[in-house]
Curated annotation (Swiss-Prot):
Name this polypeptide is given: NH(3)-dependent NAD(+) synthetase
First-level EC class: ligase
Positions that bind deamido-NAD(+): R147, K180, D187, H267, K268
Keyword line: ATP-binding, Ligase, Magnesium, Metal-binding, NAD, Nucleotide-binding
Length: 275
């Protein structure tokens, strides 16, 4: 492991690879306990999470629903609830995957909020967008979508006295692959420190189908490039990112991309600048 790999892995609290099935189950139990502790410390009984159709939100939701199930069983209190939220922008091209995720999760409640009216209304009122190129406008509005989704989740959480769950994990964090104050905003991040293949392994341990576990990850924020794979945006694969974070050798080009992107996106992982 090179020094910079160790530095980044420590900064992101990267967890070691699962040695075996027992280690995986122990990690699942630890993260479920973490979720339960967050609710207890906040003196709240509701969790809210947006479901995209990808493996990250699927895995976080499976952990959340298990935590809620355990809390209900331990307390005999039916007030403990997990709310899964669908947040489409009009019609999502992979809606069938989102619905398949909901079937696997079996959430206590499912809410749907179409963010398109809010996103379009805001974009129509921002003069600066009228002068931008189509690609710039598409990128900026893509981030508006992510932030609107988080506003919707916090609105539900506020109405139901709940906490909002985030889906960030180490393989996304190192690349800064989240929208600042959008999907990067949450009250708790139960996947933090995991690499992508660990997220997939946890989903698989819950019995999630391989079609969802191995689905090609995509942020799907930009209209001009719908369904664009994350790896096309990164310039490296998740396999390379995972290897880097676990201190394994990676191709020099991939190494350089990961380090440069980590440094460039450092502001996303920190509190706002202050004097």
């Amino acid at each position: 492991m090179q020094a910079v790999q160790q530095e980044i892995a420590q900064a992101l609290n990267v967890q070691p690879p699962f040695a075996d099935a027992a280690a995986l189950e122990a990690e699942v139990a630890r993260r479920v306990a973490f979720i339960k502790d967050c609710l207890a410390n906040a003196r709240l009984k509701t969790l809210v999470l947006g479901i995209s159709g990808g493996v990250d939100s699927l895995t976080a939701a499976l952990l959340a629903q298990r935590a809620i199930n355990e809390l209900r069983a331990e307390s005999s209190d039916p007030a403990y609830r997990f709310i899964a939220v669908r947040l489409p922008y009009q019609v999502q091209h992979d809606e069938h995957d989102a619905q398949a995720c909901l079937e696997v999760i079996n959430a206590d409640e499912v809410h749907t909020v179409d963010i398109a009216p809010a996103v379009r209304a805001l974009a129509a009122e921002v003069q600066a967008l009228k002068d931008g190129s189509p690609s710039l406008v598409d990128f900026v509005v893509g981030n508006v979508k992510a932030r609107t989704r988080m506003v919707a989740q916090y609105t539900i959480a506020g109405a139901r006295a709940g906490l909002v769950i985030g889906t960030d994990h180490a393989a996304e964090a190192v690349m800064g692959f989240f929208t600042k104050f959008g999907d990067g905003a949450c009250d708790l991040a139960p996947l933090s420190g995991l690499v992508k293949n660990q997220v997939r392994a946890i989903a698989r341990s819950f019995g999630a189908p391989e079609s969802l576990v191995e689905k090609v990850p995509t942020a799907d924020l930009e209209d001009l490039e719908p369904g664009k794979p994350d790896e096309a945006s990164h310039g490296v694969t998740y396999q390379q990112i995972d290897a880097f974070l676990h201190g394994l050798p990676v191709e020099q080009e991939a190494f350089d991309i990961i380090v440069a992107t980590y440094r460039k996106t450092q502001h996303k992982r920190e509190l706002p600048f202050a004097p």
